[in-house]
Structures are given as C-alpha cells and as structure tokens.
C-alpha cells in the first residue's frame, strides 16, 4: 500500500495492457516466451489485472493468453473481445484456466465511429452493447465493457449505454480517451457527471484508459481517478498505439510521491518498476528514452556542478523520490577484465537479472571477451550483453563468424558463417559498402523477402572502444519486426541485429494465423 491512510474506497486497481494495447504499437511484437516473461513479472510486482492479449486475433495470441491464465498466481487475467459472439466465446475459452478471469468487450459509441467504422445507428449499437455484455456475463461474473472513443461520444448516449451495460452485468465500465483528445479538466468532469447521471453507477467500478497523442495520458488518467474512477489502464514504459498509453510507472509513482494531492493507493511493488521497464524494452526492442520519467537512464543522473553539490549535501535538494524506491541502485561495482565470475554474478543480481546456469556461463564468456576489448565496462554494456544473450537463446539462426574486407578501392566483401537450425552454412557476398555486403550475405544464406525499413547505429557508452548498438526493422507480410544488438564491432552488431529481427519473423510466422482488424479501446 502506498497511501498513508488506506481504505477500500481510495484503492486504485492497476490494469496493465502492455501485452495487448502495448503490443499493438508498430514494431513492438513480442514472442510467446517474451509474453510469458513479462506477464510473470507483472504478476509478481502486484498488478491487479493483466490484459494478456486479444484471443481471436491469432492462434499465437490465444495460446499466450491461455498459458498466462494457467500460470498467473495473483492477478486477474483479462482477454479483449469485440462485441461479436465468436469473439466473446473465444476470449472466454482463452481465460478459462485462470484463477480469476475477465472478459473485456468493447464497442464504439461516438458519432464518427458509429457512422464510418461500424455503419450502425445508435439504437443498433445500444442493443449490441446489451447482447455483448449479457453473453460475456454468461461465461464469467467479471466483465468489463468499454465505450470506444468515449470522450467523443454524445453525453446522453454514453450514459444510456453505460447504464445498460451495468444492468446487463458489467462490473467494470471503461470510458477511454481512445485518440488522446481530452484534457484533464474535461476528463475529470466526464467521470463526475457520468457517475452522477447513471442511476446504477454504484454497481460498477469505473476505469480510465488514455492515449498520449497530446502528451496528457498520465495527467488525464489521474484526473479521471479524482473524478471517481478507480481503475487505471496503463502500459510499462507507456508503449502503445500511435503516441502510446498511460505509463504505469508514472501514475503509480505520482500517487505515491504526491499522496497529499492524490490520496489513493495501489498494490504495486515500486522497487520492481525499473526491472519491468528493462524487460519490456528488451522484449519489444523499443529503447527507453534517456530522459523518461521514473525509469529513464537520466531520471536519477545529475551532471550540473551546482546540482551535484546540492546532492552531496542533501539528496532532497534535487530528488523528489529515492532511486531505491523504483529499483535503481546507487552503488555499483566497477567491472573490467580482472573481474571474476563471483563479481559478475553479483553485478547481474544488482541489476535485477536472474539467468539459468547455461545462460550465465555464456554471458560470462562474452563479458570476458568484451572486457579484453574495452578499457572500462559500464552497466549499459552488461545490460546490452545479457539482454542479447536472453534473446538469442531461442534463435533459430545464429551468427558463428563474420569477416569483412573493405577499403577505398573495389566493392566491399563479406564472408559469413551461420548456424541455421543446427546446420552450418557459409557464404560470401559483395555490397555497396560493408553493411550492404553483410546484409547481402544473410540474404544469400537465408533467402527471404523481408524489406529493411530501419537501420540505426549509436554508441552504448562513451569512448572510441564503446559498444555499437544497432537497431534494425524488417517489414514482412504487413508486419514490422524490430531488433537490437550490441558489439564493439559495428558490422558484427549489424549482422546480429538483422538476424534477431529475422528470427522474430520466423517465430511469428510459425505461431500466428492472419490477424483481423486490430482492436483499439
């Protein structure tokens, strides 16, 4: 609990939709194993409701929701469903193994959505709300209904639909700011007025779901809570469609740090926030911006001499929260080529990593090799090394060796050796530059039609011996897969990043059926 005087009426339910709305962010697709890892972490850190996916979207999504439902120890496991009978029944089947399951069904209610998206009139939508909630309630007594594009819905019609949904059995009512259009005062007033005008509003918990198109998702969510909502729908790192969703770590810490103005509490173990951020970043290959609130690299960094002087005298001069409260450690070992296995294991534990014995041995070997090539090893170096080790443990295609010949004369040439599902393949290729030669080698060794959409390089740390971190995004059959890799050799990092994205495509293609129209609530 994070409030000083907790009571049930002040408790805010944290509903995490990283695995559903977060994954709808272009390029943020996660593998089956990555989803299980994220769900396990969310469950352990005290998330109340985990929206694990959209079961009817694909066999892969269904399997992930079903497996997460079986494994969850504490959280309610929720699946998203449109208003159709097949969607609802498929969702019910996916969450059936859960100790606590929820069906989240949604339907657009705004004039623009009803006219152009649904091509239905208000009465048809109203009747569909009733039938959808009724069908969902036949499967479970924990049903959430969302009025998609609720902030642009006519007020009287919104109240009518909310009242009908509660009467049909909905226990949670979500009024989302689907397109990030609202402002805090308006969102506060909307919840206050709906609760005052819907006769049976006391029979359901109201929920906020905000997008960050105007940069106000967190502010709007907190305004909705002040207006009477008691559930916040959010994602780790704020990932999500377009500009993203409300960031879990930001709303949780806002309620904790400013409990004087936001007298609410939740069950989140805030010391796990930084670890959750890193796990989601690694799984999605979406780097966290350095100045991101709460979990960014610079969130607790002070470079100005004046600030440093103040911090040394009293940390409260420039810090409104202790870094330990969100899982950031102030003290650390200086890692280098003389560090032994014990020190390496201690550093990993300090950073929040728990590796199996084989992964640990492989990571240590790579660490020693890196330490021989760098004067100093930073935490970011180890983070990149270990995250890459975890990602590669499920790879079908692995880089064994790479040699590149480049210079001022003639085409550049690359020779590469790959392990492709246990078979060793060797190829040589030329290109217009060394990177082009490397990628041409991969195409020759593993023929594919994926198109390169993004290639970016930046240094993980300072210095001429810094590791290069390469980001690659490949487009394949209407989907984009993004991957990152780090290595002191930029060309090796490029090859590893390309192969990592290719591995994601291979695994996704094997698991999924064609995806229907994406949901957005």
Curated annotation (Swiss-Prot):
GO terms for biological process: L-leucine biosynthetic process. Residues 12-274 form the Pyruvate carboxyltransferase domain. SUPFAM superfamilies: 2-isopropylmalate synthase LeuA, allosteric (dimerisation) domain, Aldolase. Its main location: cytoplasm. The keyword Amino-acid biosynthesis applies. Pathway: Amino-acid biosynthesis; L-leucine biosynthesis; L-leucine from 3-methyl-2-oxobutanoate: step 1/4. GO terms for cellular component: cytosol. It is found in: Cytoplasm. GO terms for molecular function: 2-isopropylmalate synthase activity; acetyl-CoA C-acetyltransferase activity; manganese ion binding. Residues 398-521 are annotated as: Regulatory domain. The keyword Nucleotide-binding does not apply. It holds the Pfam family HMGL-like. It catalyses: 3-methyl-2-oxobutanoate + acetyl-CoA + H2O = (2S)-2-isopropylmalate + CoA + H(+). Mn(2+) binds at residues 21, 209, 211, 245. Keywords: Amino-acid biosynthesis, Branched-chain amino acid biosynthesis, Cytoplasm, Leucine biosynthesis, Manganese, Metal-binding, Transferase. Its EC number is 2.3.3.13. Its cofactor is Mn(2+). It comes from the Bacteria. Homodimer. HAMAP family: LeuA_type1. PANTHER family: 2-ISOPROPYLMALATE SYNTHASE 1, CHLOROPLASTIC-RELATED, HOMOCITRATE SYNTHASE-RELATED. Belongs to the alpha-IPM synthase/homocitrate synthase family. LeuA type 1 subfamily. Catalyzes the condensation of the acetyl group of acetyl-CoA with 3-methyl-2-oxobutanoate (2-ketoisovalerate) to form 3-carboxy-3-hydroxy-4-methylpentanoate (2-isopropylmalate). This is 2-isopropylmalate synthase. It comes from Rhodopseudomonas palustris (strain BisB18). The lineage of its organism: Bacteria, Pseudomonadati, Pseudomonadota, Alphaproteobacteria, Hyphomicrobiales. The gene is leuA.
